[in-house]
Amino acid sequence: MTRHFLLAAALLCSACLPAFAHEAGIHAEPSDAVPAAMDIIETSVGIAGDMAVFSTRVRGSAGAETPAATGNFAGAGVYAYVWPTGLNSSDVGFEADQGIVALAVTFHPDFDDAANGGANRDVWHPHWVVLAEDAACNGGLKVVDIAEGTAPKVPATWPKVPLLIDSPDYATDLSGDTVKVTLPIALVGGLVNAAYDGVTAGLRINADLHAPLLCVDDVFKIASGDHSLPGKVSTAQ
């Protein structure tokens, strides 16, 4: 798997500060240049029993920063806490080798993208996304588009949008300074010993509503500071 996501993100990152990583997580120095709610100071992915826990701790209150509502889908903003991983897209229900697999906790007040037509625009919620390079995006990356007339393999909770995105109903909690997602490890192949990093980012729907439909627009912070997915999923002893 390439490191294109983190390499491109680094070009926009306002605070790629030194960090250190081990099996307990990736730790980063705080930065006043980053909004406190997006200023990652620690991120981790661990396994306890039959559950996996993705966690990010920030300098401020998790979830306190959200994009302004515009009332329109075109050009709508998305804020996200993201864990880019070394997983293959086939590990989360898509065709193999489609791009960079990331778990993201997102907020977007102008549209819903829950599974089965559900509403989620007013809450932070999780997605699996597959990312790829695209020079048309300000951040150099997009959520992979599904071309018209094609029918690739998608997970059962795909929200029926033309993107490689999944909307699983994982337990998601934003409390104090921490964002946490808990999911059954049986649902994700290859997670044990997988590499990961932590990123906070803004994305945006294309104002023209054509591909690339959803672009990485801005990056607030990369936990590792060196764009190398240095984290390794830990297992409780």
Predicted features, each with a name:
Residues H22, I41, E65-A74, L191-A201:
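Extracellular/secreted glycoprotein ectodomains characterized by long, lumenal stretches
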Residues M1-L6:
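Bacterial N-terminal signal peptides that target proteins for export
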Residues H22-D39:
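Short N-terminal segments immediately surrounding and downstream of signal-peptide cleavage
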Residues D134-P184:
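Short helix-loop boundary/capping segments
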Residues L17-A21:
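Sec/Tat signal peptide C-region and signal peptidase I cleavage site
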Residues A8-C16:
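Bacterial N-terminal signal peptides
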Residues W83-S89, V192-Q237:
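Acidic/polar low-complexity flexible segments
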Residues V34-A132:
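Surface-exposed, glycine/proline- and aromatic-rich loop segments on solvent-exposed faces
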